[in-house]
Amino acid sequence: MKRGIGLSAIAAALLLAGCAAPTTPPLYQWNGYQPQVYEYFKGKTSPQEQIDALEKALQEIRAKGNTPPPGFHAHLGMLYAGIGQEQQAEQAFQAEKQLFPESTAYMDFLMKKKTASQKTAKQ
């Protein structure tokens, strides 16, 4: 009887100790990104308001020494391109390529598309 209680107590202690083990920090900091993407698709905020919110979130992410999630800079670049701030859009696309090399083909496509639309607009 005492042995059963002792084993139960040891099992409970091991279970609780396993739950209390330090967890690994998340790979990316999603600070405000997902709500902004949702707002973008719902059309509830202007592009400039979204840019301001994402820039603020990016500063917070960097202040904590974390990395923004995949697509963060791409979304920011598309917002900049949408309001005509081409240089900032280019910088955001380049930042996305640098952080996530697997996005290079898509970022190149967006930059090429942006360049082509600028040439068409000038004609």
For the regions a protein language model found, what residue spans apply to each?
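Flexible helix-coil transition and linker loops at the boundaries of alpha-helical arrays
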Residues: A20-P26, L58-N66
